Amino acid sequence: MASLPGIDEHTTSEELITGDNEWHKLVIPKGSDWQIDLKAEGKLIVKVNSGIVEIFGTELAVDDEYTFQNWKFPIYAVEETELLWKCPDLTTNTITVKPNHTMKYIYNLHFMLEKIRMSNFEGPRVVIVGGSQTGKTSLSRTLCSYALKFNAYQPLYINLDPQQPIFTVPGCISATPISDILDAQLPTWGQSLTSGATLLHNKQPMVKNFGLERINENKDLYLECISQLGQVVGQRLHLDPQVRRSGCIVDTPSISQLDENLAELHHIIEKLNVNIMLVLCSETDPLWEKVKKTFGPELGNNNIFFIPKLDGVSAVDDVYKRSLQRTSIREYFYGSLDTALSPYAIGVDYEDLTIWKPSNVFDNEVGRVELFPVTITPSNLQHAIIAITFAERRADQATVIKSPILGFALITEVNEKRRKLRVLLPVPGRLPSKAMILTSYRYLE
């Protein structure tokens, strides 16, 4: 009898599964990645039976269940590993396991940085440069995780890409001492200080609000935020010998977002005292020669290294980025799968708010370090994320620009008739009488 297309006498019943919620066994060979691509509503549960596997350097414990949602990531097998998994959206036929040929570069980098830490009280200050989807953030996360494994270090992770919501909401740049293991289940690396109980140690980021989506909307403001963050980082390194010896890992935006002359990188190197540059590209890529020629005199050619694009890096589109940004905002107010938080909604009069917004060259505004007052209307503020600064409510714009960030709030409703707003706060209490900055991000519950 003729068989149906795609099905023959050798096809097992397991291969005919079209997605269920049963446990399935998978063996990942040593040195290989299981490349996972989860939908926003999909949920994957993984349990390791034997062997050692990592997610960006964070090892998964044997016999513990890990839950993942809305994430594209690889599980790397340090040694041959048997694990169980279940997910209604995955089938045994759609699983992708491939050899990873770039981990040797990451190992070499880790031991090079470790040698610097062991021989000097001033740790390495590394900036990672490359194009989109080359693995800059993956490399940053892995190097931070390996530093924690090797010794009692607290590497300072510095995120300079406002579109990456790591330990904070999108639209910010931040510096975070990685003081303990990262949460392997979260694309946002883990949670910052929270009012709820958490399974893992919270991280405390130092945050500067840029407020816009793309750095080319206001390069001057972006560079000013880096300068201010650099001052905070310098103070932290001066006061904390452990962080100073651990060093910094600086994650940058895609090279395509920077000026042709790479002026932003010069600024980053100066303000953060960078002494090592890692370039994710091939040796034949024009970027490699350009970087060596541009930064060789500044850093020394012996301190500039190339690394091939990392294996296991998933292609991401704008829809996926938006989904991660939305997830990070939701987690800020409501918590993650393991940590439920209860935000606090309050009513606020129009007269009790002073809100500014950064200038934006795409809105026919001058792209410089300047803030403009915001008129309170539904079109301006409905569903908007606002940054609450430490500056007093009636402070001038220069003071507001330089002020640290107290936290973030979500404006869920603007009632013009009653001249009131409904504001969601992460903690109970009154809205602080502080100046606020409108960001470009919105969240519709």
From Swiss-Prot:
Keywords: ATP-binding, mRNA processing, Nucleotide-binding, Nucleus. It comes from Saccharomyces cerevisiae (strain ATCC 204508 / S288c). Its main location: nucleus. Belongs to the Clp1 family. Clp1 subfamily. This is mRNA cleavage and polyadenylation factor CLP1. GO terms for biological process: mRNA 3'-end processing; tRNA splicing, via endonucleolytic cleavage and ligation. GO terms for molecular function: ATP binding; polynucleotide 5'-hydroxyl-kinase activity; RNA binding. Changing D161A: Compromises interaction with PCF11. No effect on growth. It holds the Pfam family CLP1_P.
